[in-house]
Amino acid sequence: MTNIRKTHPLLKILNNSLVDLPAPSSLTSWWNFGSLLGVCLAVQILTGLFLAMHYTSDTATAFNSVTHICRDVNYGWILRYLHANGASMFFICLYLHVGRGLYYGSYTYTETWNIGILLLFAVMATAFMGYVLPWGQMSFWGATVITNLLSAIPYIGTDLVQWIWGGFSVDKATLTRFFAFHFLLPFIIAALVMVHLLFLHETGSNNPTGIPSDSDMIPFHPYYTIKDILGLLIMLTALSTLVLFSPDLLGDPDNYTPANPLNTPPHIKPEWYFLFAYAILRSIPNKLGGVLALVLSILILAIVPLLHTSKQQSMMFRPLSQCLFWLLVADLLTLTWIGGQPVEYPYVIIGQAASILYFSIILVLMPITGTMENRLLKW
């Protein structure tokens, strides 16, 4: 008798995606982050759902409702901190996942890659709107500063900003719509994840060597299910440690002060996972130029497949490209540090240098290095 998982219309789909899926035998731990991101999304949706049961999206009561969740709701504090720090874990996994794709040339699967970029933008939008909901000082001023950037768009900018605000400033209407979108987007993200996996399973997974692995495949279960569970345990341990021992480590103290439109915080800055993009935005003195650089800092990923000049897919056997890749990582860490510093000497000039280097590595140095390595190998 045939196993039900291979015949049942619904179970058959799950079986072909999670059990009998042929996977390359050489996948390293860098391939764990896809499943970890799935778990992060599930955790965020579940904790978010329970938080939404107690949260009120009104300027008069939003801050107090978050306080009420932490003080009066059974285990409300752990829900709130799991949700806030879960977002940080989400972005750590996201950036490592994208980094893996860049290092091993997974961007050559263009459909999967482009859906991934779309997912990255969707998660960033969701995180930004979520940061506004507690209605603390940094929530209010962060929302004001970032939405105001759209006013740099010629001709329609000012109208667009007021349309998003639902008035002439960030106020009750803004908070209500941000809550609505923050609730809706994760479900759109979940649907996009399905499409992401659909395209991935059309081609099959890449592997560290970048060489087709059709001749050497193993079933996903039990080999990679066990491997993913190990990664999951490590991530959940890290998240639990963060939530239970130092829940406010990655947050901003200013957000424990209720939003006050009459009092600007000394340093307005986003959450740590947006600091690199914020540093690129600030490094250009012109408003429209800064906004363009901000968008391009992420959108540049879309043209990476076009800039691939090497005859090898992966960087595994390309030491010169490896050096550039790790220089890019160091540069992004520098930008993250600069984004959290005040706008003064020497931080401004360091930020400008790091921003130029960021775009130079991706647009110029990496393609040149790829061609150079081909020549060195006489290809």
UniProtKB/Swiss-Prot annotation:
Residues that hold a ubiquinone according to the record: H201
Cofactors: heme b
Keyword Transmembrane helix applies: yes
Listed A to Z, the keywords are: Electron transport, Heme, Iron, Membrane, Metal-binding, Mitochondrion, Mitochondrion inner membrane, Respiratory chain, Transmembrane, Transmembrane helix, Transport, Ubiquinone
Q: Where does heme b b562 bind?
A: H83, H182
Keyword Transport, does the record have it? yes
> Any one Gene Ontology biological process term?
mitochondrial electron transport, ubiquinol to cytochrome c
Major site of localization recorded for this protein: mitochondrion
Q: Which residues bind heme b b566?
A: H97, H196
Topology with regard to the membrane?
A: Multi-pass membrane protein
Q: Which stretches are transmembrane? A: 33-53, 77-98, 113-133, 178-198, 226-246, 288-308, 320-340, 347-367
One cellular component term (GO) for this entry is: respiratory chain complex III
Q: Provide the protein's localization.
A: Mitochondrion inner membrane
Describe cofactor binding as the record notes it. Answer: Binds 2 heme b groups non-covalently.
Highest rank taxon of the organism: Eukaryota
What Pfam families does this protein's entry cite?
Answer: Cytochrom_B_C (PF00032), Cytochrome_B (PF00033)
Coiled coil stretches, renumbered? none
Q: What is the role of the protein in this entry?
A: Component of the ubiquinol-cytochrome c reductase complex (complex III or cytochrome b-c1 complex) that is part of the mitochondrial respiratory chain. The b-c1 complex mediates electron transfer from ubiquinol to cytochrome c. Contributes to the generation of a proton gradient across the mitochondrial membrane that is then used for ATP synthesis.
Q: What else is known?
A: Heme 1 (or BL or b562) is low-potential and absorbs at about 562 nm, and heme 2 (or BH or b566) is high-potential and absorbs at about 566 nm.
Q: Write out the similarity annotation.
A: Belongs to the cytochrome b family.
Q: Could you give the subunit structure recorded for this chain?
A: The cytochrome bc1 complex contains 11 subunits: 3 respiratory subunits (MT-CYB, CYC1 and UQCRFS1), 2 core proteins (UQCRC1 and UQCRC2) and 6 low-molecular weight proteins (UQCRH/QCR6, UQCRB/QCR7, UQCRQ/QCR8, UQCR10/QCR9, UQCR11/QCR10 and a cleavage product of UQCRFS1). This cytochrome bc1 complex then forms a dimer.
Q: What is this protein called?
A: Cytochrome b
Organismal lineage: Eukaryota, Metazoa, Chordata, Craniata, Vertebrata
- What gene name is given for the protein in this entry? MT-CYB
